[in-house]
Curated annotation (Swiss-Prot):
Lineage: Bacteria, Pseudomonadati, Pseudomonadota, Gammaproteobacteria, Enterobacterales
Any Pfam family the entry gives: Trans_reg_C
Gene Ontology biological process terms in this record: phosphorelay signal transduction system; regulation of DNA-templated transcription
Family annotation (Gene3D superfamilies): Winged helix-like DNA-binding domain superfamily/Winged helix DNA-binding domain
Organism: Escherichia coli (strain K12)
Family: To V.cholerae cholera toxin transcriptional activator (ToxR).
DNA-binding region(s), residue ranges: 3-105
Protein's name according to its UniProt entry: Uncharacterized protein YqeI
PROSITE patterns the UniProt entry points to: OMPR_PHOB
Stretches that traverse the bilayer: none
Amino acid sequence: MYWIINDNIEFWPEHRKLISVHNADLNVVLTTPASRCLSLLLEAFPDVVAQQDFFTRVWEEEGMRVPTNTLYQNISIIRRGFRAVGDTTHSLIATVPRRGFKIHNDINIQNHVINSSTDAHTHNAPPAIKVNAGYKESIGGAKNFNNKILKHIKSHLIMLSAFVIGAYSAYWLWNNNQPKPFFKDYKTVAEINGCHFNVTEDTIDGLKEFDKYKTRILDSGINCKKHPWLYFPLAKSSPGMIVMACNKNYNQHEVANCLTLSYREVNRD
């Protein structure tokens, strides 16, 4: 099953992926909580999804309790994903004060269910092959014989060229359609007590602030055995800090099972 949003964006919940309908090269992989939040919004459309419903369905059923700010961060991740792959200049998600969030009423939402048996038949069907009726017998001597040989060689060369071009095109398309990891610009700068600390490459020069962030994270009681991969920016301009804690390396696993941690007033210490 997948969704088409406003005729511009495909959302595949199973793969947590947003894809441009018009350009498959534009695609984004959402975090697990953000993907669950978007699924709730689409299933409830055009109704409002209450904040408590998000907390219950996305986090509490997984045994986690998170602050309200974590919900807002995941809605922000969805909005950024929409802007990255969709031909839209306005927000598709509306904030309903003191209630929750919803998809705007004027947005076109379509739910598509894939017929696996039909797809399997389509993909497994053998390619159609055109067979020539054959060569007419010729009565000529060596000249006609040579012409037949040349025709056979030419035909085989054309088939070989078409195969090589097709194989190269398939390889190029496969490589360019791979999802772009959400944390592809993050680098591991330290491994402490089983936790891998990853920051954006453009903030590595600010590592003098790293000890303060590291201490705050470790003191919060993070379980490094369950969520050993930590991703966060070293942004001094923000009073708080958002950390994505995953149980697998996000850049090597499409499903990394991440949760969002929010720390307030980190840069006011």
